[in-house]
From Swiss-Prot:
InterPro entries in UniProt: Na/ntran_symport (IPR000175), Na/ntran_symport_taurine (IPR002434), SNS_sf (IPR037272)
Residues covered by region (Disordered): 1-42
Gene name of this polypeptide: Slc6a6
Record's compositionally biased regions (Basic and acidic residues): 1-18, 29-42
Glycosylation site positions: N163, N179, N190, N281
GO terms, molecular function: alanine transmembrane transporter activity; amino acid transmembrane transporter activity; amino acid:sodium symporter activity; beta-alanine transmembrane transporter activity; gamma-aminobutyric acid transmembrane transporter activity; gamma-aminobutyric acid:sodium:chloride symporter activity; taurine binding; taurine transmembrane transporter activity
Cytoplasmic side: 1-49, 564-621
Database matches in PROSITE patterns: NA_NEUROTRAN_SYMP_1, NA_NEUROTRAN_SYMP_2, NA_NEUROTRAN_SYMP_3
UniProt protein name: Sodium- and chloride-dependent taurine transporter
CC per GO annotation: apical plasma membrane; basolateral plasma membrane; cell projection; dendrite; GABA-ergic synapse; microvillus membrane; neuronal cell body; plasma membrane
Record-level GO BP terms: alanine transport; amino acid import across plasma membrane; amino acid transport; beta-alanine transport; gamma-aminobutyric acid import; import across plasma membrane; modulation of chemical synaptic transmission; neurotransmitter transport
Length: 621
């Protein structure tokens, strides 16, 4: 087929096949329907809205508290080798794939796969399960940050001294620890830091285990309610509100990170901290765990396999050059992670010098960095209240825009399933309120005295790297080997005016699936049951619950395949051929061969087959 004819077919395909189903415009009101206006899917008011929304969605807490620690732990500068291999081999290709599918189909994270390849629409359901679980526990971090922010508005920070009601007789302030002769004469194991006691005894009121949940922490419950209310009002009007809020939430954290970077680099001991952060240890690359950490960090930091990037892309205009901006956003994301390491480790180097200990003794990851190491560092600086307020505002904004972008992706995907019902009147807003309320109630289990154990269980299993790798593999497999990488490239050319370099197509077909399979297998081989603080061992029932959370998303893909095959009549070969082919208004081919479509939503099954030119379907024709 000539190139012009091919492109014209693609234009017709997008117009007639992949166009949004009726009633999919956020904010469509009864008066619009009364005027007979055909509802159109809302689009970003400008490309800056999309760019800042994506930047806010994946530049989050993981860039600040996870990447620097992984870099130090896994060989310093040597860690960048597997990191960049996974970045160009899987991170950027999958990120762009999700955005461009959303833009091409104008659909959310579930219905886009129903139009591209109905048999594998379970990919969308798996993504929604993951992001729904993620939204429940990720926002708890913001509740902790909010609590710390409120506590920072004091002349003396409450975690700087041992004279509070929650402190124990074993609490020792750092001024005493610095007195080496006094410290050596005592047993270090018998004493704790005021910042640790504030975290464990005041903020968490930590119980003895997950089977002792204890009472609800009302102060944290109110903080959690506050951040959920902020999240709701940021997204309740769809992209009209989200696209404007990110002008502040996605840019201000970068300014504060720059301020913290400059401050950290001017502290004594900063040079040693940065050396510790980047000094390469090539021998660490022999450890498979280093490669697993690199792969999972890429998937976490790019917010892929969650349906959020697909939903954000679905609001792009059809001719928008998303390839260019996706590449620039990828550079921004990874660059932020790298620069954050300088800000964090310069301060950790200062801490180590002030305490007279090795940097390895103060280096933390995750909540340990945000709520123990850094709060401890600000107590050693001039103007500790100012730096504490600045840090927790930055932390709150970094997490908040990631949270509401992920919730927006979740809502868009679910609303697109039932547009004729949820797009009427104010039903979308009511639905968002219901989803946020349910997520808040589930999150209350994590702000009890045993809530930290529940939080760690969700973090370790519910949105684990294994789940994301599983989804990414099937996304690439479907596009490269069923829909056809060349077919998608034709669509991309029609949208942006040119074909991207072939490395994307090769990554979808070979490189990304290979990296996902390798990382997936090694993750299972190297699996270690969850512990808290390397001391508390979770009971067997909790480990089983954790695996249940992980499998709840992974099982969606094979489960949907089985359900669709069972609900479609005809010979198995014909059913498969019918279900792996994109839909078209004019029925032909398969139905003449005796396959009868299953009875699902009319928007999916009112069409039949587009003549395929991709690998697996061609072998079955």
């Amino acid at each position: 087929m000539a190139t012009k004819e091919k492109l014209q077919c693609l234009k017709d395909f997008h117009k007639d096949i992949l166009k949004p189903s009726p009633g999919k415009s956020p904010g469509t009101r009864p008066e619009d329907e009364a005027d007979g206006k055909p509802p159109q899917r809302e689009k970003w008011s400008s490309k800056i809205d999309f760019v800042l929304s994506v930047a806010g969605g994946f530049v989050g807490l993981g860039n600040v508290w996870r990447f620097p620690y992984l870099c130090y732990k896994n060989g310093g500068g040597a860690f960048l080798i597997p990191y960049f291999i996974f970045l160009f081999g899987s991170g950027l290709p999958v990120f762009f794939l999700e955005v461009i599918i959303g833009q091409y189909t104008s659909e959310g994270g579930i219905t886009c796969w129903e139009k591209i390849c109905p048999l594998f629409s379970g990919i969308g359901y798996a993504s929604i399960v993951i992001v729904s679980l993620l939204n429940v526990y990720y926002i708890v971090i913001l509740a902790w940050a909010t609590y710390y922010l409120f506590q920072s508005f004091q002349k003396d920070l409450p975690w700087a001294h041992c004279n509070h009601s929650w402190n124990t007789p074993q609490c020792m302030e750092d001024t005493l620890r610095r007195n080496e002769s006094h410290w050596v004469s005592l047993s270090a194991a018998n004493f704790t830091s005021p910042v640790i006691e504030f975290w464990e005894r005041n903020v968490l009121s930590l119980s003895s285990g997950i089977d002792h949940p204890g009472s609800l922490k009302w102060d944290l419950a109110l903080c959690l309610l506050l951040v959920w209310l902020v999240c709701f009002f940021c997204i309740w009007k769809g992209v009209r509100s989200t696209g404007k809020v990110v002008y502040f939430t996605a840019t201000f954290p970068f300014a504060m990170l720059l301020v913290l970077l400059v401050r950290g680099l001017t502290l004594p001991g900063a040079g040693e901290g940065i050396k510790f952060y980047l000094y390469p240890n090539i021998s660490r690359l022999e450890d498979p765990q280093v490669w697993i950490d690199a792969g999972t960090q890429i998937f976490f930091s790019y917010a892929i396999c969650l349906g959020a990037m697909t939903s954000l892309g679905s609001y792009n205009k059809y001719k928008y050059n998303s390839y260019r901006d996706c590449m620039l956003l990828g550079c921004l994301n990874s660059g932020t992670s790298f620069v954050s390491g300088f800000a964090i480790f310069s301060i950790l180097g200062f801490m180590a010098q002030e305490q007279g200990v090795d940097i390895a003794d103060v280096a933390e990851s995750g909540p340990g960095l945000a709520f123990i190491a850094y709060p401890k560092a600000v107590t050693m600086m001039p103007l500790p209240t100012f730096w504490s307020i600045l840090f927790f505002i930055m932390l709150l904004l970094l997490g908040l825009d990631s949270q509401f972008v992920e919730v927006e992706g979740q809502i868009t995907s679910l609303v697109d399933l039932y547009p004729s019902f949820l797009r009427k009147g104010y039903r979308r807003e009511i639905f968002i309120a219901i989803v946020c309320s349910i997520s808040y109630l589930l999150g209350l289990t994590m702000v009890t005295e045993g809530g930290m154990y529940v939080f760690q269980l969700f973090d370790y299993y519910a949105a684990s790297g294994v789940c994301l790798l599983w989804v990414a593999f099937f996304e690439c497999f479907v596009i490269a080997w069923i829909y056809g990488g060349d077919n998608l490239y034709d669509g991309i050319e029609d949208m942006i005016g040119y074909r991207p370099g072939p490395w994307m197509k090769y990554s979808w077909a070979v490189i990304t699936p290979a990296l996902c399979v390798g990382c997936f297998i090694f993750s299972l081989v190297k699996y270690v049951p969850l512990t808290y603080n390397k001391v508390y061992r979770y009971p067997d029932w909790a480990i089983g619950l954790g695996w249940g959370l992980a499998l709840s998303s992974m099982v969606c893909i094979p489960l949907v395949i089985v359900i669709l095959l069972c609900r479609t009549e005809g010979p198995l070969r014909v059913r498969i051929k019918y279900l792996i082919t994109p839909r078209e208004p004019n029925r032909w081919a398969v139905e003449r061969e005796g396959a009868t479509p299953f009875h699902s939503r009319a928007t999916l099954m009112n069409g039949a087959l587009m003549k395929p030119s991709h690998v697996i379907v061609e072998t079955m024709m």
